[in-house]
């Protein structure tokens, strides 16, 4: 049984950056079966656990499920052009472990809010 897992990362809101000087990235994995998927954040290739919150349960959409994880950091870390943020979805498919990773960095960011 093959199913299509997709992973997307959403940028922080300008409001949060302006009002709280924090930036939250949201990673959404969808198209998988329950208990088959974990989400991990990496910053510059290093696993990050601080500031990470992952939903305890996946959400059902028809026959497949989705799961959301958030990574919160100081705004300056988000604006540092050298930083590379990555969400990795690890899951089982056809008896083997597979992974999909999505990266977001300054190329895809909005212009800095002055």
Regions found by a protein language model. Give the residues of each.
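Terminal anchoring/processing modules of extracellular glycoproteins
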Residues: 1-114
């Amino acid at each position: 049984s093959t199913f299509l897992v997709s992973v997307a990362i959403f940028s922080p809101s300008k409001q949060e950056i302006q009002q709280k000087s924090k930036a939250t990235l949201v990673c959404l994995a969808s198209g998988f079966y329950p208990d088959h998927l974990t989400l991990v954040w990496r910053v510059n290739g290093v696993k990050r656990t601080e500031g990470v919150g992952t939903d305890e349960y996946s959400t059902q959409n028809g026959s497949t499920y989705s799961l959301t994880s958030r990574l919160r950091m100081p705004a300056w870390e988000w604006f540092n052009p050298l930083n590379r943020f990555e969400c990795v979805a690890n899951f089982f498919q056809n008896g083997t472990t597979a992974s999909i990773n999505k990266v977001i960095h300054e190329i895809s960011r909005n212009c800095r809010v002055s």
